[in-house]
Amino acid sequence: MVSCLCFRPSRKTKLKDKSHKRSIRNQTSSSSAQPAGTAKEVDSSSSQTVVQDSSRYRCQIFSYRELAIATNSFRNESLIGRGGFGTVYKGRLSTGQNIAVKMLDQSGIQGDKEFLVEVLMLSLLHHRNLVHLFGYCAEGDQRLVVYEYMPLGSVEDHLYDLSEGQEALDWKTRMKIALGAAKGLAFLHNEAQPPVIYRDLKTSNILLDHDYKPKLSDFGLAKFGPSDDMSHVSTRVMGTHGYCAPEYANTGKLTLKSDIYSFGVVLLELISGRKALMPSSECVGNQSRYLVHWARPLFLNGRIRQIVDPRLARKGGFSNILLYRGIEVAFLCLAEEANARPSISQVVECLKYIIDHTIRKERRTRRRLLGGNKDGAGTSRSPDETMMRMLEEEEEYVTSEEAIERRRVIVDDARTWAGMNRRGATPPTPTP
């Protein structure tokens, strides 16, 4: 992998209220351990506990009437999204503050558990790349969560089914979104104590503010990670098709590396412009609908350009070498063996490297185009000729035997790491 795999350990942030930390751990464990249809109903006293302790969690209790007024009685014109556990409305408080209100589905017990986990998690966890919780409503049978309003919607809204006139995201914006999401995940994994497994990372759960700054949302499936003497958390498999790590989908064993796999899928979506579970219309014959299965052989065979989103290719503004590096990072995260995947801190450093070099390339290209250029014989070249030559140089590298062999070495390194971890040996340092 590239030299940016070096990273600095993150500072831990402990959840100071230990009694409530245990309470949340119990709530998150109970939210998934029971098989569907047999889970014990969460009684209203659990929700009342949240209400009574709201001052300790720095969030506001809203009345149902207050939120109904804010959302114009939850009418369709206020509707901004639907999810697996509820419907989201845009609202405006009497203070003028814009908000997003998620009304949890009353038809299932799981919705009440989701409510408890989400409110408690977001009350304790605060980071610039996590959505901010304003408060909640637990009045009667109503369960509503109130967030900051994110004006640009989700990443999913900017990748698929674009409206007429809607611009596709450029390379730098896509990589900045990936970096912000990775930083949010790094906070959950490295700074929260105990670590938090997000468990529901996908493009529809990454929201964007007016500057395309991403924030992770929807924490109803989040769980505390394993304690020091355990390698994983065993739980009922939940999540979205196309994003679940294979070891979690097959065995229910959940680790921080399960989130890394999901992040790899998101990064691959950002680069390819394809859904994690592709429509059958995009598949040929018996081809798998899973994006990962579609893209992996293309990556291994050096057919990088077939992976990239055509809209991204048309916009330009990126280097073929950096595109190749981005896909490398995605497939490191998508290693079949959990122990072969990088940590989220390593992923953050890799993405910083890619963005830094993207910005440098922009500046270098601008200087060359504005200042003109000359070939080796001293003959001036036009801006178009200069750009064409730069693209040819990059293409020569990406399709070279060296680059193809490098891809195979990355896969071999991942397998070596996984094998040695299974045997309890110390794995070697990844190839730089």
Swiss-Prot record:
The modification Phosphotyrosine is found at Y147, Y248. Activated by phosphorylation at Ser-234. The active site is at D200. Phosphorylated at Ser-44, Ser-47 and Ser-234 by BRI1. Residues 74-354 form the Protein kinase domain. It is found in: Cell membrane. Residues 25-35 have a biased composition (Polar residues). GO terms for biological process: brassinosteroid mediated signaling pathway; positive regulation of brassinosteroid mediated signaling pathway. Its EC number is 2.7.11.1. A lipid is attached at C4, C6 (S-palmitoyl cysteine). Residues 15-24 have a biased composition (Basic residues). The modification Phosphoserine is found at S44, S47, S204, S234. InterPro entries: Kinase-like_dom_sf (IPR011009), Prot_kinase_dom (IPR000719), Protein_kinase_ATP_BS (IPR017441), Ser/Thr_kinase_AS (IPR008271). It is a lipid-anchor. It holds the Pfam family Pkinase. One of its GO terms (molecular function) is protein serine/threonine kinase activity. Residues 15-47 are annotated as: Disordered. The modification Phosphothreonine is found at T235, T240. PANTHER family: OS07G0668900 PROTEIN, SERINE_THREONINE-PROTEIN KINASE CDG1. Serine/threonine-protein kinase involved in the positive regulation of brassinosteroid (BR) signaling and plant growth. Mediates BR signal transduction from BRI1 receptor kinase to BSU1 phosphatase. After activation by phosphorylation at Ser-234 by BRI1, CDG1 phosphorylates BSU1 at 'Ser-764' in the phosphatase domain, increasing the ability of BSU1 to inactivate the negative regulator of BR signaling ASK7/BIN2 by dephosphorylation at 'Tyr-200'. The full kinase activity of CDG1 is required for its biological function. This is Serine/threonine-protein kinase CDG1. It comes from Arabidopsis thaliana (Mouse-ear cress).
